[in-house]
């Protein structure tokens, strides 16, 4: 299932007046509560939100819609988020899109596995408002145009 939700305030896309507060963000998350919270936080910050509930739909949306940032759940049904991220990073059409892992994994070595798959950062669940937006803003500011 895929939804495209505009930001609450609207805004231009990466033109002369683009800012990191107006990004197109793809969320790949199968948990409805986590998805709803992420959508709310992103829209409240002025971002346009695209959503997918599995990795395959996320890969298709990433190729077709070219988001500014992808938030990828690690534990997805079927193909997991690390495998999907590795595929995104091997594809010339999507390799430059920053991917931030959304994960409840907090064991020693998990960050290394997440980075090795190609993720540019990660956010631990449960999502904390300030940490969530700080990581996203940092990635958007440093992402290539």
PLM ranges: what are they?
Residues 127-136:
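C-terminal output helix
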Residues 73, 103:
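Active-site residues of response regulator receiver
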Residues 62, 71, 84-85, 89, ...:
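Hydrophobic alpha-helical motif in two-component signaling modules
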Residues 36-44:
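Charged docking surfaces used in two-component/phosphorelay signaling
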Residues 29, 53:
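Conserved acidic carboxylate
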Residues 77-80, 95, 107:
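The feature encodes the CheY-like receiver
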């Amino acid at each position: 299932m895929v939804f495209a939700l505009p930001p609450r305030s609207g805004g231009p896309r990466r033109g002369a007046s683009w800012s990191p507060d107006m990004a197109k963000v793809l969320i790949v998350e199968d948990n409805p509560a986590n998805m709803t919270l992420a959508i709310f936080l992103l829209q409240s910050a002025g971002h346009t939100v695209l959503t997918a509930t599995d990795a395959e739909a996320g890969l298709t949306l990433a190729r077709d819609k070219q988001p500014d940032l992808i938030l990828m759940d690690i534990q997805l049904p079927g193909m997991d988020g690390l495998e999907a991220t590795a595929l995104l990073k091997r594809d010339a059409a999507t390799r430059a899109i920053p991917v931030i892992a959304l994960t409840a994994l907090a064991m020693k070595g998990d960050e290394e596995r997440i980075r090795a798959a190609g993720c540019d950062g990660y956010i631990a669940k449960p999502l904390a408002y300030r940490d969530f937006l700080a990581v996203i803003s940092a990635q958007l500011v440093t992402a290539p145009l």
